[in-house]
Amino acid sequence: MTEDGKVVCRDCDLTFNILKMYKKFYDLKENPFNLTPDPDFIYLGKVHQKALAYLTYGLEARKGFIQLTGDIGSGKTTLLKSLLMRNRNKIKSAFIVNPKATFEQLFRMILYQFSVIELEADYTKDVLLGKFYDYLMEQSKQNCPVVVIFDEAQNIDISVLEEIRMLSNLETEKIKLLQMIFVGQPDLRKTLLLPKFRQLKQRISVAFHITPLSREDTEAYINHRLNVAGANGKKIFTKSACTEIYSYSSGIPRLINIVSDATMLAGYVGEKEVLNGDIVKEVINELIEDLGQNSQQDEFLSTA
């Protein structure tokens, strides 16, 4: 802390300066492999193109319940943010990122995001449902779909899932007033196959599972993110480098980002403008030495 009371984070300054010099060395405007989901950097390989088409169809056709699953780090959240950005003037949306709550807490958060109530408003459940129905009817008159996205839906309590299902009863004779997208890890599919969720499963009319990128898509993904960051077509990673990254990451976007970022940092330190497979191998070996292959991957993937 300085004499005038300001807190100084020297480690933060060091990290910022390294990142700044790393970008300057490779002539980039942004960090190409940031772990934060950013729709501007989305790469639509064959699988993600198909997933986006399924989601778009589900919303436009007012299908009600939509299910999207994929492994940790497969790009689900980034894909959804891209969907919302593309349709920001066509739909009203609420994004629930922490579904570990009671139904009333989740419902209040949904209504708050739609500006129907203030969070501290003291209304009974029946009044909340009435207000939500009025809101949905108003949006329906304007032909504006309303969608609620539950991220990490495998964490929703079983009793809460049943109450969420009841919201699908908010409909007219012609259309569903509310669209809901359940996004989660593969466990979500297993949960919804349980007999107790038969009615909910029957209402899911659109479902898609995101699989990892292929080797070819992994290379295209890396080059796409570099170009968005300002590489302008300059090849920084060789084919052998992309092959090594694919072998370690198994095509999981988050792991691709982690290894690619670490490799570019190593390249900056070693003043290597072109990164080959040998450099990637060294970086991967260092990652494995730190925590071991399985624990390393698990730790990185769990930090969504």
List the predicted regions and their residue ranges.
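C-terminal alpha-helical "lid" subdomain
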Residues: N227-A304
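Conserved NTP-binding/hydrolysis module of P-loop NTPases
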Residues: E30-F33, K90-K92, A101-E120
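Short regulatory helix/loop adjacent to the ATP-binding pocket of P-loop NTPases
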Residues: L83-R86, L188-R203
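A short, basic N-terminal segment
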Residues: K6-V8, C12-R62, N294-A304
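Conserved AAA+ ATPase "SRH/arginine-finger" region at the nucleotide-binding site
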Residues: I96-K100, L192, S205-T218
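Conserved AAA+ ATPase "sensor/coupling" helix adjacent to the nucleotide-binding pocket
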Residues: Y112-F114, P186-D187, P195, E216-N232
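Walker A/P-loop nucleotide-binding motif
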Residues: A61-S82
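Mid-core helix/loop region of P-loop NTP-binding domains shared across ATPases and GTPases
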Residues: T102-L106, I117-E163, T172-I175, L213-T218, ...
